[in-house]
């Protein structure tokens, strides 16, 4: 047994006391230091950029409000009410605005300043200059997102003080210059060779060539936004960006991997209670477009008996569906599948009741709503009596939103399971969210060519490359025959670039009379020019381009489809039904709906009350910059104005 002598005990005790004393001092310092706070030396710009890219994905709370309920509704990428009929929620707007300002724009502003400080004081790493440009580029995207929602944005905010605001004209001038300068610097700035740093860029891994391509494509997008209000500025910036080279391949696509759960990387369309139903706009664009038959696309035997002839419209129930809308398909129930449809449609929206399709979405998983396809129509003169039971399995329908008035009491058919809905692959958080696809670059170049600007491709080449890129992304077939098709969709547009013949005002089609059961001829009318915001033509090159851009950008880029319609009035958007007055849209009535106006469509979001009440000088500067009332139907700088 070992026994310490007194000397050893004394020495051990002194050492222990000294150790305890040192540890106590260290513990005291640690207790008085915030364990979650990082010093300026500990924070790296890539951490801040990573935070901003991730937060921009939008957690489910913000995504449901901004991406789904605002953008997809405003951009007509799904069937919805709310914003489409003038409604908005200050809570939704506040949640979105504060999140993007605090979690995206503030970190990016800090990252830019941090890199600048390091460059000036000589402590910068070799790749800090390129990281600074990445932060500038992503900051431009975030500024453009806010500006395109609210019509104004703060450029000098996000540093603690109450900001002032500028309008879209000033904001776009700033953003276009930022993109030009950042892209020019990235042409020569050394990229990161640090593997750990590169992992923090979920889009491009700090590949400077890819970020430069994105900057150039973003510059093309923003330049084109000014095409109707400042063509000179738009042309100059667009031509420079196009010459420098943008996103033109799948490998350059700006996309970020989603993941399941509840955080910023969770899928933006993942909430099961959001139905994501096919919109009449999308349906009218794809029906008849491209000349590819449903029989060619749907080869499984279960579809064969449901496919209808190409000239068949469906069953006419004009006493059960609203007619106070510019939707040319109003009043019909399609009792099967269309004879001809764009091949991307069945890849994006899954046929009602097609539960054998592995991409069928069973959401909400806690009910049978998605798989219930049988409902009743009531007697038009006695809503207590059943008129007909309809099973909508294997059908393709998209009924207009808005006010159905008394028709709600006699039509139970408008349900989750009776209409095509967005495919599961877009909803289950396993996909990559696309912020900029290669197809968009091509469609932008095609539009620039139509405008006579100097670009590296002809309009036809760019247009067809955009379509091919979209088909490849969707895994759709028959693209070669599609590109030569001269068949018109429901709004009078064909695919073939060289086919610009306008359709006749009417065409004779077949339908079944829902009340007599007899097959009849029906005079189908394409939407008249008075029912369109874009009045130049139904089948010119610009209409073709924006039609294809809309289809290709569905469902990932609803803010772009909304912005294109605000800018051009393209593609054709139907008006909501107005069987009874709309509370937030009194300008649209049953007697005026057929002659459309800019204010029949939402133009922006009112500013959050946190700005209205918490920053009055800032709010006053915002309204002055907006140049109009802080309301949903006030057009922003680059948009079409009410005539």
PLM segments and residue spans:
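C-terminal structural cap/anchor segments
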Residues: 451-565
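Membrane-proximal, proline-rich intrinsically disordered regions
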Residues: 25-72, 356-357, 361, 582-643
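Structured, solvent-exposed acidic/aromatic patches
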Residues: 77-473, 538-540
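Sec-dependent signal peptide hydrophobic core
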Residues: 8-14
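Detector for C-terminal structural segments
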Residues: 555-576, 581-584
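Beta-strand acidic-aromatic groove motif in beta-rich domains, primarily in extracellular
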Residues: 61-70, 153, 234-235, 560
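Short, hydrophobic/amphipathic alpha-helical patches that form generic packing surfaces
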Residues: 46-58, 343-354, 468, 544-555, ...
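Bacterial Sec-dependent N-terminal signal peptides
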Residues: 4-8, 19-48, 140, 345, ...
């Amino acid at each position: 047994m070992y026994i310490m002598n007194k000397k050893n005990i004394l020495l051990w005790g002194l050492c222990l006391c000294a150790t305890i004393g040192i540890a106590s001092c260290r513990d005291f310092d640690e207790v008085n230091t915030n364990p979650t706070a990082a010093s300026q030396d500990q924070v790296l710009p890539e951490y801040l950029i990573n935070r901003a890219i991730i937060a921009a994905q939008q957690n489910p709370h913000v995504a449901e409000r901004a991406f789904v309920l605002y953008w997809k509704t405003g951009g007509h990428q799904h069937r919805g009410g709310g914003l489409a009929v003038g409604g908005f929620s200050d809570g939704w707007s506040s949640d979105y605005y504060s999140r993007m300002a605090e979690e995206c724009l503030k970190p990016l502003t800090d990252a830019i300043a941090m890199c600048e400080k390091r460059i000036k004081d000589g402590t910068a790493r070799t790749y800090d200059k390129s990281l600074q440009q990445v932060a500038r580029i992503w900051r431009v995207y975030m500024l453009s997102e806010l500006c395109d929602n609210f019509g104004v944005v703060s450029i000098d905010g996000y540093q603690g003080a109450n900001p002032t605001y500028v309008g879209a004209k000033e904001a776009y001038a700033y953003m276009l210059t930022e993109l030009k300068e950042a892209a020019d610097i990235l042409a020569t700035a050394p990229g990161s060779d640090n593997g750990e740093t590169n992992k923090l860029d979920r889009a491009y891994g700090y590949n400077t060539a890819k970020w430069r391509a994105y900057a150039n494509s973003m510059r093309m997008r923003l330049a084109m936004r000014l095409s109707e209000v400042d063509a000179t500025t738009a042309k100059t910036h667009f031509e420079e960006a196009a010459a420098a080279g943008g996103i033109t391949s799948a490998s350059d696509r700006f996309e970020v991997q989603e993941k399941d759960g509840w955080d910023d990387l969770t899928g933006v369309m993942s909430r099961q209670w959001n139905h994501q139903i096919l919109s009449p706009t999308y349906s009218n664009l794809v029906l008849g477009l491209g000349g590819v038959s449903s029989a060619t696309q749907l080869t499984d035997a279960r579809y064969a008996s449901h496919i209808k002839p190409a000239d068949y419209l469906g069953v006419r129930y004009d006493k059960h569906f609203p007619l106070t809308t510019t939707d040319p398909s109003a009043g019909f129930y399609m009792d099967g599948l269309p004879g001809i449809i764009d091949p991307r449609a069945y890849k994006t929206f899954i046929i009602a009741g097609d539960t054998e399709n592995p991409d069928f979405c069973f959401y909400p998983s806690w009910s049978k709503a998605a798989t219930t396809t049988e409902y009743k129509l009531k007697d038009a003169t006695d809503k207590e009596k059943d008129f007909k039971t309809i099973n909508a399995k294997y059908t393709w329908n998209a009924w207009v939103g808005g006010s159905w008035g008394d028709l709600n009491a006699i039509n139970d058919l408008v349900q989750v399971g009776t209409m095509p809905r967005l495919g599961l692959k877009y909803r289950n958080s396993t996909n990559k969210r696309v912020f900029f696809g290669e197809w968009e670059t091509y469609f932008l170049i095609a539009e620039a060519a139509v405008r006579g600007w100097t670009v590296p491709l002809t309009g036809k080449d760019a247009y067809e490359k955009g379509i091919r890129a979209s088909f490849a992304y969707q895994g759709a077939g028959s693209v070669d025959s599609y590109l030569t098709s001269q068949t018109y969709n429901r709004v009078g547009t064909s695919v073939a670039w060289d086919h610009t013949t306008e359709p006749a005002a009417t065409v004779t089609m077949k339908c079944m009379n829902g009340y007599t059961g007899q097959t009849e001829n029906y005079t189908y009318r394409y939407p008249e020019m008075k029912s369109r915001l874009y009045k130049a033509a139904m089948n010119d090159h610009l209409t073709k381009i924006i039609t294809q851009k809309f289809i290709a950008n569905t469902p990932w880029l609803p803010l772009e489809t909304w912005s294109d319609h605000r800018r051009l009035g393209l593609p054709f958007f139907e008006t909501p039904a107005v069987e009874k007055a709309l509370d937030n849209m009194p300008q649209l009535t049953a007697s005026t709906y057929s002659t459309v106006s800019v204010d029949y469509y939402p133009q922006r979001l009112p500013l959050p009350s946190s700005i209205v009440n918490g920053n009055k000088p800032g709010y006053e500067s915002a309204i002055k910059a907006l140049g109009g009332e802080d309301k949903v139907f006030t057009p922003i700088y680059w948009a079409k104005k009410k005539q």
